[in-house]
Every structure is written in structure tokens, then in C-alpha cells.
Amino acid sequence: SDVYKRQFMSWYNEAIFYHIYPLGLTGAPKHNDYSAPVSRLNTLLPWIDHIREIGCTALYIGPLFESVGHGYETTDYKKLDSRLGTNEDLKNFVAACHEKEIKVIFDGVFNHTGRDFFAFKDIQQNREHSRYLNWYCNVNFGGNTEYNDGFSYENWGGYNLLVKLNQRNPEVQNYICDVIRFWVSEFDVDGIRLDAADVLDFDFMRALRRTAAEVKEDFWLMGEVIHGDYSRWVNGETLHSVTNYALHKALYSGHNDHNYFEIAHTVKYLQNMGNLDLYNFVDNHDVERIYTKLSNKAHFAPVHVLLYTLPGVPSIYYGSEFGIEGKKEKFSDDSLRPALDIKDYADAVQKNPCTALIAALGKIRQHTPALSYGSYAELQLTNRQFAFARDLDGIRVIVTVNNDDNAADMSLPAGNCAEYIGTLTGRKVPAVSYTHLRA
């Protein structure tokens, strides 16, 4: 069939995401002293028009909730971080996005909590007698940590600041499902990106999926998964999507090494997992900016053409549409999460070639259902040139990219089409049995 998952059509199949790390973008202090709320989230309201202008239709924003530092050591799942403002501010922000027809998903940090979370504090206070002992993994009163609590516990990633929740405990499951219900009723959120989904318990994710189905039609669950067979997570029982780190790696190294075989092989490998709508990205708050990563800055264009046209849901990390740089440092991700003022980029779509390209690709994708639902077929592949087709209901979209310093002629089978239209240029190319395209 020509139809690529079309029977499951939902807003997220056609979405183009924008990704904001709010504590960074708003320039919030690194440490939360839990003092009176400061409404920094409101400074992001002017970004909403920009998000629409570059063609994005959904926003992934987070972490948002009360925490002591970078946002992933949660203190309170039901309260906006004081450094960002009040729950009322968040409610208004989501409503403003919805007014512009932008869906909103929050970061859900459910693998671990911070040490200031109420259940952990209860264990510190009541020790062996705490009713929350089984909310965490491997609490051991024969051990200790650098915090000198008089007990040890399982953490995430070697950081004792992040205390691993016991997701098999029905009380924990019920509590987190209740958090999701609260986020929907209080803020009208449209989905959740699950932090550290690759270490979440599968039964726990099944419980989240059941809750997602109850709270809102088309409520989207997307998980952070680095390695592995993505179909273990993306299926009818657990998550709708996961982060496509495999394609992320291939997109930059396939250009840096002049090796389109790596990208084509990765796409084939992903296709073999089934029709998964993966969350595609070239950078985010944890990895170096694409503009920094690319040896040849001119490759910004073919990288993003592929991001927007290969199977999956594309995402842009705030600031990367302007071509900003950001190098990962050894002990800090601050350089990847800068404060920016949208006023400094007022005419970016007109004046910045990177932004103009992203806006043009956004428009093309929005008006080309084959890029969301079409089947995928590789047409031509060399180290330096790559062509593929997306087919849907008799419409064929052909994408050609070239990573060489010189223009290249590519001969491609024209299929049954009478003519081709060069989408970025608008010029028509008559179709013969083979069509020559200069990439």
C-alpha cells in the first residue's frame, strides 16, 4: 500500500517540533533557592510567533517543574519551577501556544527525583519507619553517600543527586499517572517526552500509555532512548515515538566523512524495525550544536533537507535555526543551553540564510503529505550524492542531496510522472525515463 501509517493519522504524525530548554533560554539562575517565583516564562511568549513563522507546529519544552538545579532533579511535579514563574504563567503560556495552533509537550522526568522530593525527605526523617521506603530502589541503611544521610540508594548515571524511583511499586505508578492527569487538567498539555526512557520499567510505561489514552485523544508519549531496537519502545502498548539518536549521528558524520552510505544504511536499518514515527533531530540540549559539529558549514543545508524529508518527525532545537554554535564542555552543558533574546533575531527569516532555509523546509513539509506519510525508496547512492523518493497516493516527492564541493549531475528514474517541480526553486523539470537533476 502507498499508505504509510495513514490510518493512525494524528497531529504528531504531521508535526514539526521546536524544542526549548526554558531554564537556559530565559537565563534563569543555575541554582534554585526556592524564593518567590519570578515570571521568566513570560519572556518566551514572543517566541511563539517566531515558532510559527519558521513552520513549526509543536513545541517540546522542559524541564519545567520545581527542581534545585538543571531541572532534572525534581522537587515537585505539580509546581512550575520558581525560577520560571507560577502555575498560572505556565497555563497562560500553553494557552497562547494553542491559540497559534501549536501543540505542547512537557518533559516528564519520572525515572528519578531530586533529594528535596517529599518521599525522599520522609526517608531522611523517618528512616526505616518511612512509609515511602519502597518508593525508591535499593535503599540500604548499612550504606552511606557523600551526603551523609546514613543510608545509600540507587541513583541515575552515577549522580546521587538523582534518586532512582521504584517504578514497579504500584503507589509510584499511581502517583506519576496522577501527575499526568494533573498536567492535562491544569495546563492542557498535549503529550510528554519521557526522560531516560531507555531505563524506564516497561510495565510502568504501559501504565503511562493507558493513562495517556484516558486523559486526552491523541496524547503523545515520546521517550528518550539512545541505543537499541526502537521497536521495543515504540508500539501499541508503550510509547508512540522515541528520540532517533541513530539518525542524529548519521546526519552529521555522513556529511563530515562524505559518506552518504552511512545515512542510507541507517534509514534502511530503521525501516526494518517497522513503520515507526521516530523523533528526528540534529541537535538538542545534551549534544553539540549542528553548526559546531559540521566540518563544512555549507552542509547545514543538506543536513536539514534530510531532517525534513526522511521518514520521521523533524525537530529544531532553539537557536539552531539561526546557525548558532555550541560546544559540549566536560563538566557542563551550559554552552548548549544559552539565554537568547528573540528581539536580536527579528528579521532572521529575511536576513539569515539558515533561518530562511528552515522556514522554507517547514512550508514544504506542511504542504506535502508524502513527507509525513509516504513510503520511502532509495533511488541513487554514492559517497557524495544521495536520492530517494517518498510516495503517497500517486504523488512522488524526489529528494536529492550532494555533499561534494562541486555541483553533480544525477540521473534518476522518473516513474509515471509527467513533470517534476523543483520544490525549493519552483522550476519545472520535464520527466523522461530518466531525469537529470543538478544537486
Predicted regions and their residues:
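Conserved small/polar residues in nucleotide/adenosyl-binding loops
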Residues: 1-7, 435-439
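N-terminal structural segment of carbohydrate-active enzymes
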Residues: 5-103, 118
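Loop/helix patches that line or flank the sugar-binding groove of alpha-linked glycan CAZymes
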Residues: 8-14, 31, 36, 262-417
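The substrate-binding groove and active-site-proximal loops of carbohydrate-active enzymes
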Residues: 23-41, 73-85, 159-172, 190-198, ...
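Aromatic- and acidic-residue-enriched segments that line the glycan-binding/catalytic groove
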Residues: 73-81, 112-147, 236-245, 331-335
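Active-site-proximal helices and loops of the catalytic beta/alpha 8
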Residues: 94, 124, 185, 195-274, ...
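Core domains of carbohydrate- and sulfate-ester-processing enzymes
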Residues: 118-162, 250-266
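C-terminal beta-sandwich/jelly-roll accessory domains of carbohydrate-active enzymes
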Residues: 405-438
